[in-house]
Amino acid sequence: YIIVLGAQVRKDGPSPVLKYRLDKAVEYLNENPDTVCIVSGGQGSNEPWSEAEGMARYLQEKGIDTARILPEDKSQTTEQNITNSKKLMKEGASVGIVTNNFHVFRALQIAKKYGLSDVCGIAADSTPKYLPNNMLREFFAEMKWLL
């Protein structure tokens, strides 16, 4: 399995952060044709539909077979992404977490906390001009999670 962690979707498609994640997922899925992809993310107040639905549409448009895509459309946080996605997987399955490079460290910590022992990070790029802001936000999210 791979789990693509959600980020904002818009009427015109995924946000830049999410597009990086989805493009990395497409690359991985094309290289690993037996892998099932869980797209994980609920609907925020500023989103036209759930992140999972938007991600599934994008992957389908890029040629990924619908049978390989499992939507998880309730999550609002990274912890919920992991715990809700885990319920869709076979016990003891190996999993890759697809997220942006600045988010991999915390996502893997959370995954291990919730019992995903055979887990690895699949790092997508991020927009360089936003990287300082993203790193700062991630630092505070990490501190909050640790406390």
Which residue ranges define each predicted feature?
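A transmembrane-helix-recognition feature enriched in membrane-embedded lipid enzymes
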Residues: L131-L147
